[in-house]
């Protein structure tokens, strides 16, 4: 056998290499197809365009999908190609493939058989692709006869031979694997025959049929090999095949081998769908090493054979996953039966072997369904439905296998942890590919492949919760292949919720692989309809997750019961026994519900996502569905459509009720997805993945830890269900609110199990906040934001719990989710505003906080500060002084101007400068905060700056910048309102309000920045706006009403003082230019004087004229002009710099001339309304040409209010 195994391993390696190349090529082709679907993938993101975080995620996810493709190119490509070759159809048409390959009448059974056959065809796809269709349908239909006829003898022979042969070789392993599976089924007695034909349909007989199909379909050998291994071992452990002791021994040997092989297999479990492809592609050497270890054992051959042929199993895996779920459902009922001493014996002896084998089988994905079919589950479930009975059988065998697998995987987890390193690579790849944070959570518990296998199990386990690990992995693969059909059958599944439970596990795997990311995001809402039924399995599964930390096999039991984790097999039987009620009932629909399962997969992907093995299979499936990943947006829609089919279930309602939120969640999921790859690669990564999956994983994990800690499987299931299926609905909503949930989940979840993931979640939120508020001062705003989000997160979390508690609460949750979506949108808007103004607002709040201290010192500083403001405006020094004193109070009596500004900048600048930079635009929104900050009361503390007391106002720099943005926003709002008005007078009034806001913005800008350029531009634009206002109507005409004349005075005074402010901004430059120009003209005048004597016409005027020029720059300019005109100056060239300087100088000085001119015009109009302005000056202050802009705004606003009152009164 060892020699054969080595020979066959070589053959398998060759086949693997060939298939790898073929799959890589096909994968590349499919990848090319993926880009075509990329737009679909982008669509979901488009829904969340407004969300900065979502857009980042979109970018990340898009890149990640590509990376994921590359990472899983080998596995994915192989799987995709294998699946395509096997089914001769695209991965996505898995359901169509099933339908096309298998008659619709026997579609479910065909799916099982085909999936079983397809595994073989997958490997055969290399050389037996043509055989696959033939085998699939013939076996699907002939299976019954084959089953009945050859179930006992041929199957037993095949089993024995295959078991031994698998030890011996891999190519023969196909046939032997099938036979072995049949043999195992034979041990199950004629179950294999019935199961082949009725594997989905007939519960008790159907356990063997999957193996029979495997047997008949030698193409399915990869699965059959893995499945046979598990079957043999599980039969032995479960006592199903006492006569199969040789096979069992072979299985045991294979199991023994499998632990080592599981080194390969664990690598395979991560990419369960096509673990062999990923293993060959990733670790052919690894597989060979395990081969060296396992060669003596049958498992080695299986592992290599499975690996090569597993590649083609993507669809088979999905299809078989379909079977698996059926198997798993009965597994619950049968688990008790299957929990036999043989299991304990086999567990002890072949726990590791079984774990490896089951892992490999899961990887192969063809075995678990047959194994599931073989075992007692048929008895457990047959009563429920004829089809469910098959499913029950499958589930029961799966459960048996799972129990064995659990025990073996528990033991094997230890042994496999050694393999863990190799598996970890695959797992990381598959995890990253899967980008399933839940998978990642399980992954940390079982970093090694065996955990991944159990992890893969949880998906089906979540569905079946008692399915064997291999069954689960198979169900994962089946779900991968059948998830699409499942999503359609999910509708029927919802109709037959009790039946669907078993099928659900399968879809989770598919979803895990791709749909998990896609459907989980979108389809999960659809899945929630099943949520109530699948809720229990997910809830238990969370607990199983928790136990998976201790033992991967426990995950299986966990799926059934968190407390039974230790005795995963026994506990599983009870939980699964209930689930058979649910899932086995659903099983018959599963047969009818290939689409439904997909939906189920959508729901459960969260849970399965945790399984690393499932992650691996997902990687493979994702390889197949990678195109789907890209078109995930479409897939989300499709899945949504499927859920719509499922509309019967609440998830549909949730999806339809909150369709838009569901899309953002999908983007968020993509977000999670993108972040998941890295997390899945590292344990710390899983936490990030959780963060990414925040909604999914945090709920999932938080719920899982809770359920684990709580121990009650249902409590865990409830939280898990909310995280998984109801969480699908919730996640539909919660994903909408994913951002808030991460924080909430972080708080809730971090304490439970994934404290780091919450931190990661916090980090993510922090990243958003960081981008907006990077500095510590921003932390307050971040905390506030986090708090804002977290309370909703708490609500969301609680709502999710409620949804898990009762599906009836799903509607509430959806409403809550919708509200949360609104809240999330609000939060996002708030984040944007906060990013702009929260930094400012945080600074405002901080300043407000500091202001309390300021007032105390304000009294003293008011006394101290009044002088500085007086300099700017003696009339209103007190107000500026108060404002300054407040800010200076912060400075603690330091230099009011610089020290206050420096202290404030120290206080807030650390965060505010960046905030301002980031929030330059947002600072306008901070004007809203301005009122809250308390600056509004003294909105013009900086105005003194224009008066020349700019430094005293500088302490307000942070406030000012934030205020500047707020004022700018307010000004633009007013301006837009004014533009919409038709009445010219009303429009002019509204424009004046905008002018005042613009002036305030300029004041804040001037006080905030050292440079006066920005303030100067604001003032300049404001002056232009005032000119436009004055052009709307001749307000200053003699015939104009008194109110309009008053309005004209206010406008002209604003314009005049603004011109003075503009001059002050450029005063230093004007003085500098004046000196330079004077020097230049003096030198030029001297040069002109020399030739001037020769020119009589010139006379002394031209030479003398330059002399007075120093006195007045204008005179110097004129004299220069005269010199030029004299003709002597014609020879003198004026430097360009001088020309520019002169032009700038004239422009700057013209502001003063304009200001005086306008002021005189305003004074003339003021005389006609002395009473009004006298009262205004008394109430506010006397406005002068050198008044500060703060005084101007205060004065103008007060006068404008009085003017409006006068306008209303008449």
Swiss-Prot record:
GO biological process, one term: regulation of gene expression
Composition bias type Polar residues, residue spans: 215-238, 394-419, 586-602, 707-724
UniProt xrefs under InterPro entries: AF4/FMR2, AF4/FMR2_CHD, AF4_int
Residue ranges, compositional bias (Basic and acidic residues): 9-35, 78-87, 245-259, 536-546, 688-699, 732-747, 816-834, 906-932
Mutation effect (residue 1204 to K): In a breast cancer sample; somatic mutation
Entry keywords, A to Z: Acetylation, Chromosomal rearrangement, Nucleus, Phosphoprotein, Proto-oncogene
Pfam families: AF-4 (PF05110), AF4_int (PF18875), AFF4_CHD (PF18876)
Stretches with biased composition (Acidic residues): 423-439, 473-497
Region Disordered, residue ranges: 1-45, 73-314, 366-957, 1098-1119
Disease implication from the record: A chromosomal aberration involving AFF1 is associated with acute leukemias. Translocation t(4;11)(q21;q23) with KMT2A/MLL1. The result is a rogue activator protein.
PANTHER family cross-referenced by the UniProt entry: AF4/FMR2 FAMILY MEMBER, AF4_FMR2 FAMILY MEMBER 1
The protein's name: AF4/FMR2 family member 1
Species of the source: Homo sapiens
Underlying gene: AFF1
